[in-house]
Amino acid sequence: MQCMLGTPSHAKSYPFPVPGRSYIFRNGKVEDLSPDGFDRAGRTPVLAAGSNQSHEQLTRKYSVLEGHVEIPVQRGKLGGFDSVYAAHLAGYGSVPSTFYPSPKTQVTTYVLWLDDAQLNRMHETERNYTYDRLENIQVVIDGEEVLTTAYAYTAVV
């Protein structure tokens, strides 16, 4: 596992900037998501709480992969959960967040559509979390589509 130590200012800037819209993360760059969508075959929907929503964090995590890296990232609203502080420190010194059940709450999140290599890399960077399948959820993507099953990394709170 690669350690992602940073400066105190890096830790304090958590959860890092997000584009505020759905996008394609392509080799460290943010690009517009095609109106025609993308091919979901072979991809797993993973909800991002905290820094995994940020293209800056995705760049840090995925720069170790060889070849072309392309991750569709969709902005959505997750119902019945909130994003709260986790009970541990990240490797770079910030207090990260995790999803926690919260009826009547809606939180903005991003859905990362990861292929197998990207998912394996994400597992390597999320060792303080459990990888959970969330069923019967409601993620309204870009105000239209509803996703009812996805995965998330959950931490002790």
Give, region by region, the residue ranges found by the protein language model.
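Glycine-aromatic micro-motifs
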Residues: 1-157
